[in-house]
Swiss-Prot record:
[2Fe-2S] cluster binds at residues 95, 100, 103, 115. The gene is Sdhb. This is Succinate dehydrogenase [ubiquinone] iron-sulfur subunit, mitochondrial. The lineage of its organism: Eukaryota, Metazoa, Chordata, Craniata, Vertebrata. PANTHER family: SUCCINATE DEHYDROGENASE [UBIQUINONE] IRON-SULFUR SUBUNIT, MITOCHONDRIAL, SUCCINATE DEHYDROGENASE IRON-SULFUR PROTEIN. Its cofactor is [2Fe-2S] cluster; [3Fe-4S] cluster; [4Fe-4S] cluster. The keyword Ribosomal protein does not apply. It comes from Rattus norvegicus (Rat).
Length: 282
């Protein structure tokens, strides 16, 4: 310290001036510490409903969280609320990295993943959280995805070969170019954000397969290793499974992975036109 003071004095600074600088620096640090310690209270309004409670009706319940003591994502706030404020709050979550799709929900009016959606730091705004829309609710933020998964199963989302004699004995290879055709399709995590944002799916969810399932159907239709493309197309010929899509494009807008289900559906429609022409000429 003496050496520093000596250098400072040689440059024209007095010991008194140096002392003032030190005091100002200390005051600045104390002010920063005080500012950081000031609570930043954020209000969350969360949909609650417990079917096991007699007479319980859906309602919005508010919780207050100090953002200084919480992670940056909405899922961090939900976990903090469950762990420290209300253990009865129920929601799905797993990977916390936008990979599994478990924590899909409606946050401030848009379907997204709670683990990748940052908390709105405007303390004057209430963050509203609902389960995925137009789905039966099991409890709180947990939607019933039974119909969604049944529809996914119906498209047989796996590689199908007409000659299965070599199954398990050799690899089914494909070119780099054919593999690249699957980009933007295989990344789907089946979170159902797109399907539950689609008005056509709201109206005809029992018959219309929805954007998530149709995009996966297209993924297998264009896989060069699959040999059941025509059979897959034949399953979609009825008026509802495919053709309830009216290109509203909510699906593409809301996809948390940045995929384009609307485009995939349009490609299936083009394939269907060719398929029907081929059948008419047969």
């Amino acid at each position: 310290m003496a050496a520093v003071v000596g250098v400072s004095l040689k440059r024209g600074f007095s010991a008194t001036a140096l002392g003032r600088v030190g005091l100002q620096f200390q005051a600045c640090r104390e002010a920063q510490t005080a500012a950081a310690a000031a609570p930043r209270i954020k209000t969350f309004a969360i949909y609650r409903w417990d079917p096991d409670k007699a007479g319980d009706k859906p309602r919005m319940q508010t919780y207050k969280v100090d953002l200084n003591k919480c992670g940056p994502m909405v899922l961090d706030a939900l976990i903090k609320i469950k762990n420290e404020i209300d253990s009865t709050l129920t929601f799905r979550r797993s990977c916390r990295e936008g990979i599994c799709g478990s924590c899909a929900m409606n946050i401030n009016g848009g379907n997204t993943l709670a683990c990748t959606r940052r908390i709105d730091t405007d303390l004057g705004k209430v963050s509203k959280i609902y389960p995925l829309p137009h789905m039966y609710v099991i409890k709180d933020l947990v939607p019933d995805l039974s119909n969604f998964y049944a529809q996914y199963k119906s498209i047989e989302p796996y590689l199908k070969k007409k000659d299965e004699s070599q199954e398990g004995k050799q690899q089914y290879l494909q070119s780099i170019e054919d593999r690249e055709k699957l980009d933007g399709l295989y990344e789907c995590i089946l979170c159902a954000c797109c399907s539950t944002s689609c008005p056509s799916y709201w109206w005809n969810g029992d018959k219309y397969l929805g954007p998530a399932v149709l995009m996966q159907a297209y993924r297998w239709m264009i896989d060069s290793r699959d040999e059941f493309t025509e059979e897959r197309l034949a399953k979609l010929q009825d008026p509802f499974s495919l053709y309830r899509c009216h290109t509203i494009m909510n699906c593409t807008q809301t996809c948390p992975k940045g995929l384009n289900p609307g485009k995939a559906i349009a490609e299936i429609k083009k394939m269907m036109a060719t398929y029907k022409e081929k059948r008419a000429l047969a």
